[in-house]
Swiss-Prot record:
Family membership noted in the UniProt record: Belongs to the aspartokinase family.
Name listed for the protein in its UniProt record: Aspartokinase
One BP annotation, GO: threonine biosynthetic process
InterPro entries: AceGlu_kinase-like_sf, ACT-like_dom_sf, ACT_Aspartokinase, ACT_dom, AKii-LysC-BS, Asp/Glu/Uridylate_kinase, Asp_kin_monofn, Asp_kinase
The organism of origin for this protein: Geobacillus stearothermophilus (Bacillus stearothermophilus)
Site positions per UniProt: Contribution to the catalysis: 7, 74
Recorded catalytic activity of this chain's protein: L-aspartate + ATP = 4-phospho-L-aspartate + ADP
Length: 407
């Protein structure tokens, strides 16, 4: 057979009982004749607990020392999983990110993987061992330990699958797959059997938390087939791959949404490109992520620009904008972003009109809109967020089309 990479998140290894369950899932794959590489996150809330410990020492801890501290969380879970497999009669070896040959750039807290030397992993596999790798971490060329930021364990797993030329990468989570929308809010949400990399990447970027965007981007670039599955259920999950053979007739594949959005409008900025660039360069330098951007001319000499941000970034955004001479800044909080995604929109005109019609019928005002080939995002009042998602979910027939699949 081939190499299979499995990734288990913090919830999946959150207790000794769950680690024992994960060991059994790993053994099931080994018994199929596959070589197995397992990537695990820190147990449960371990990372949060480590962050809190650091805050008790310092309000502004060194990023280098934070990486040293946070990287210990995964070391606990990989060692315990290896011990569990030993007790069940299987040869297993745990490796930290740097022992596994994962080299990253020189950026503490949010490093990107630059290279993976798979020599040691392959040697362990050749010796008949199950290899368990700590997610979320690596080492620079100068020997400094780094962490990969949010979603880092997903990225570790996909990067290893690419480097090892694995048959596929299974991402085990606390949900059974990728749904048409969040089933906690929309009861008619259904699981999607297959979805393309591009569609999954859009959903991930829009806040669908099942997969991190960086991991999906890695999978797309290296054509790594992904399956999102539940660690607690034997139910088949959602395949993420290049070619989607089913449901091609579906115009919309999923709906993502997020609350705590604020619209910021800057009026009276000088009407030339450098002026606008100065605003967004300053925001980027402060680590503020700007989403939808709309620019309008107010007169022959000045213009206004509106953009959306996370509400938590508002205080820092206002600090940046206060430095602009002659500009008048307004903002509106209590907003939400609702987005529909689907490759079928490329060849089906009128999707945006249908979205506007559905929202208008519910008396929902659209405050901002952004449209791309496979995505339409709208910013609306937060109080209408769930009802808007429900109405769009029904209008595009998502509840009837994407049925769950059991193995």
């Amino acid at each position: 057979m081939g190499i299979i990479v499995q990734k288990f998140g913090g919830t999946s290894v959150g207790s000794i009982e769950r680690i024992q369950h994960v060991a059994n899932r790993v053994i099931e794959e080994v018994q199929k004749g596959n070589d197995v590489v397992v990537v695990v996150s820190a147990m449960g809330k371990t990372t949060d607990e480590l962050v809190n410990l650091a805050k008790q020492i310092s309000n502004h801890p060194s990023k280098r020392e934070m990486d040293m501290l946070l990287s210990t969380g995964e070391q606990v879970s990989i060692a315990l999983l290896a011990m569990s497999l030993h007790e069940k009669g299987y040869k297993a070896v745990s490796l930290t990110g740097w022992q596994a040959g994962i080299t990253t750039e020189e950026m503490h807290g949010n490093a990107r993987i630059m290279n993976i030397d798979t020599t040691r992993i392959r040697r362990c596999l050749d010796e008949g061992a199950i290899v368990i790798v700590a997610g979320f971490q690596g080492v620079t060329e100068t020997g400094e330990i780094t962490t990969l930021g949010r979603g880092g364990s997903d990225t570790t797993a996909v990067a290893l699958a690419a480097a090892l030329k694995a048959e596929k990468c299974d991402i085990y989570t606390d949900v059974t797959g990728v749904f048409t929308t969040d089933p906690r809010y929309v009861k008619t949400a259904r699981k999607i059997k297959e979805i393309s990399y591009d569609e999954m990447l859009e959903l991930a970027n829009l806040g669908a938390g099942v997969l991190h965007p960086r991991a999906v981007e890695f999978a797309k670039n290296y054509e790594v087939p992904l399956e999102v599955r539940s660690s607690m259920e034997n139910e088949r999950g959602t395949m993420v791959k290049e070619e989607v053979s089913m449901e091609q007739h579906l115009i919309v594949r999923g709906i993502a949404f997020e609350d705590q959005v604020t619209r910021v409008t800057v009026v009276g900025i000088e009407k030339y490109l450098q002026s606008v660039a100065t605003i967004f360069t300053a925001l980027a330098n402060r680590g503020i992520n700007v989403d939808i951007i709309i620019q309008n001319a107010t007169n022959s000499e000045t213009a206004s620009v509106s953009f959306s941000i996370r509400t938590e970034d508002l205080p820092e955004t206002l600090q940046v904008l206060q430095a602009l001479e002659g500009a008048d800044v307004h903002y509106e909080s209590g907003l939400a972003k609702v987005s529909i995604v689907g490759s079928g929109m490329i060849s089906n005109p009128g999707v945006a009109a249908r979205v506007f019609e559905v929202l208008a019928d519910q008396g929902i005002e659209i405050k901002m809109v952004s449209i791309s080939e496979i995505k339409i995002s709208t910013v609306i009042d937060e109080k209408y967020m769930v009802s808007a998602v429900e109405e769009l979910h029904e209008a595009f027939g998502l509840a009837e089309e994407a049925a769950a699949v059991r193995s």
